[in-house]
Amino acid sequence: SIKEFFSSSQLSQFMDQVNPLAELEHKRRLSAMGPGGLTRERAGFEVRDVHHSHYGRICPIETPEGPNIGLVGHLATYARVNEYGFLETPYLIVKKAVTADAKELEHRILAEAVAGIKAGTKLDADQAAKVAKEMKGQMVKVKPFVTLEIDYLNAIVEDRKVMAHAGILLDEHRNMTEPMVEARVKGHPETIEAELIDYVDVSVKQCISIATALIPFLEHDDANRALMGSNMQRQAVSCVVPEAPIIGTGIEDKAARDSGQVVLAVEGGEVIEADAEHVVIRSKAPAGAKKEYIDREYPLQSF
């Protein structure tokens, strides 16, 4: 009867809990079918195909192999749904000018001669102070650099901007070092002047889903095989004694934590009791407490 309740709507499903990844990815699944949507029979190739607006929002790889191919998708790693129901993806803002402030100007490369300092000079603290004094309250043109500010963009806004990928060359202060960079202009790949870049990808795994990001050396795989790999990872039965993989991509820890199937301790301590139902961890009490230590009990998920 529980199963019946969950299948009362076409878009409601009983949660897939084969392993932590299956649960996480099931919660991030997207469908073009259901009430007000398409039907398998009516959907042609056009609808199922990967579109440039999917970048950073819907994974181009993880989709079922059967009749649902391209109709059921998965959220990309950093994508989010905004208050209006649109998918957004984050980008780092690129700046080409800064306010005449010594702190802001330090380590920036001048785009034009200012205060007797030649264009192309990387400013040190003294030079930055000199320029700041000369240009007080004005904007100083610098070579493009990637800030740590993030903007979430939907596909419509992104289409009007010029986006560079996360693999572009930057120096240790995030200045762009190449005069020409590979970028997406209106969704199409081009090589363009660095000065024209508006945003840079947050990460190289921005356009793919969590399951796909778990595949090591994904860039060497054929797309069809990567699709099979992403889908089959969700079907793997968990080990009784789990081990860390010898080769990983670095996202394993985050995926496991966010799946909701892992019991996390509030703080480190000594395990003083453990069985199939619970774990008790003893940690130092905070300063000023009456007790010397605190025992915290964590119930385990047991079936």
What does each model-found stretch correspond to?
Residues S1-F303:
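Intrinsically disordered, low-complexity regulatory segments
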